[in-house]
Amino acid sequence: MSTAQHLSVQSQDQTLLRAGRWGDAPRDVLLLHGLAEHIGRYEHVAARLVQAGWRVTMPELRGHGKSGGKRGYTESWHRYVEDVQATAALIGKPYVLVAHSMGGLVALSTLLEATRPPCVAVALSNPLLGVAVKAPAIKVAAARLLSKIWPTLSLANELDAKAISRDPAVVAAYEADPLVFGTLTPRWFTEMEAAQLRLREGLSTIKIPLHLMLSEADRICDPKAARAVYEAYSGPKTLALYPPLFHELFNE
């Protein structure tokens, strides 16, 4: 399979996003990456979906890959939602959302709103519905304060690359990838918290079929938080558990 066809997507606030497209099938998947990632890390995922009869479109969310925006920053989580909506408009017809990690929280945040064209189903891989390692209270308090007075301050995200996959080659490639970054900002953190709260409060409004892929050995996103959301979900749902696998299920 060839590499992605690169497209340019303009989000609502005029931020330019790079997107990739694979295949030309009549059925569409909108694929979303995790924090600090880019479309190049999902070529193999897109290839499998194309083989299964799907056309795949994937944006690099603002601040990621070669899209515009500061790394590890968004002024509002809703800006990510707008990035997804702009990509969906490019697709122009009903689609399925497939999302990993941070992309899972962005996907569900998008589904809290009416989408045009509509999303007809969603599949999530270890979504960011909670963090596996809780930050000390003093760090959380500092992040909330800095979000108000210095929201764009770049700080180390403290993500352990060895926790993404059991495959040493995947870890080595991740650590050497020039488009992967290791920073976050206080505003990103508080917007993530707010998005998780909005999801818990509005979950009952999402009714489309949900497929959740969950690793109980995930040391990055909290599998218990994702499982709680799954149990509370009132629409059609299926759950696939992969107990021994690490965070990046698509790279195990």
Residue ranges and their predicted role:
Residues 206, 212-214, 218:
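Short beta-strand/loop motif that positions the catalytic acidic residue
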Residues 1-22:
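N-terminal cap/lid segment of alpha/beta-hydrolase-fold proteins
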Residues 26, 34-37:
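Active-site glycine-rich loops that stabilize anionic/oxyanionic intermediates
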Residues 245-252:
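Catalytic histidine-centered segment of alpha/beta-hydrolase-like enzymes
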Residues 102-185:
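Alpha/beta-hydrolase-fold enzymes
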Residues 36-39, 65-91:
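Catalytic nucleophile-loop/oxyanion-hole region of alpha/beta-hydrolase
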Residues 46-69:
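Conserved alpha/beta-hydrolase
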Residues 208, 222-231:
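Short alpha-helix in the alpha/beta-hydrolase fold that links the catalytic acid
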